[in-house]
């Protein structure tokens, strides 16, 4: 969330800028952010041909430890890799632009399991493909395919087997990642589609509330302006702040006591 609790951080950069320790030019195109866990840096990239997404591991002095091709990128507009890896208990979880959910062993980069979520769950996405990062919680990997079969699914983090599927909203997925929130001791998952914000029970997958009144004009809806939520909602003290792109505006919701309902503030 952009908040750091480390000691000794610089209050400002030196006038000549921070010292460059190392760099690499072998990642290919992509929008992934680096993740540093247990003295290693993990990031996703692309091969030179643009046909495979690649999971990279580096030591903190810049030595490449391994790379693993794990999935097929989105092949339409902007086919660059999207997902930032989620690291949990010695495993890395990534989602390809075509909707493959993949678990890798961080020790050697070998694929532990792989599920073609785009095909299995009949994914329905916008014109820029799948861009979410996996949420890992309670030994479950959360993914939002959208569409007419389901909206959000949970996979077993160890095996990739389906744990639950939520009901379908019949809407495109967005470009946000699932958000885990705790409201008055109740843990919920908040997700976003192209038309809705919704809350999910993490134990059962039941969608407990939806919010669709985004204030979009009929003209915008006629143009097909949906599925463009770019940022995961922000949560604080029972409130959710949701933003959208292309002049669609932003709004704030307030969860009720047990987080089974959300109303516009």
Regions found by a protein language model. Name each.
Residues 1-265:
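Noncatalytic, solvent-exposed loop/strand surfaces
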């Amino acid at each position: 969330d952009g908040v750091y609790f480390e000691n000794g951080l610089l209050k400002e950069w030196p006038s000549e800028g921070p010292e460059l320790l190392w760099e690499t030019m072998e990642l290919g195109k992509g929008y992934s952010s680096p993740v540093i866990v247990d003295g290693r840096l993990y990031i996703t990239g692309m091969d030179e041909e643009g046909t495979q997404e690649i999971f990279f591991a580096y030591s903190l002095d810049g030595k490449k430890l391994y790379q693993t091709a794990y999935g097929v990128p989105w092949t339409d507009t902007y086919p660059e890799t999207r997902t930032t890896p989620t690291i949990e208990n010695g495993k890395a979880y990534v989602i390809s632009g075509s909707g493959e959910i993949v678990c890798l062993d961080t020790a050697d980069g070998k694929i532990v399991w792989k599920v073609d979520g785009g095909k299995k769950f009949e994914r329905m996405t916008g014109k820029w493909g799948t861009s979410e990062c996996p949420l890992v919680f309670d030994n479950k990997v959360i993914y939002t395919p959208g569409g007419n079969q389901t909206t959000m699914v949970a996979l077993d983090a160890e095996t990739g087997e389906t744990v639950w599927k939520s009901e379908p909203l019949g809407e495109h997925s967005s470009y946000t990642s699932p958000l885990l929130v705790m409201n008055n001791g109740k843990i919920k998952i908040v997700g976003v589609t192209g038309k809705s914000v919704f809350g999910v029970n993490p134990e059962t997958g039941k969608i407990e509330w939806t919010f669709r009144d985004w204030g979009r004009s009929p003209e915008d809806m006629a143009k097909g302006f949906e599925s463009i939520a770019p940022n995961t909602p922000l949560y604080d003290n029972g409130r959710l702040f949701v933003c959208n792109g292309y002049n669609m505006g932003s709004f704030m919701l307030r969860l009720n006591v047990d987080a089974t309902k959300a109303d516009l503030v």
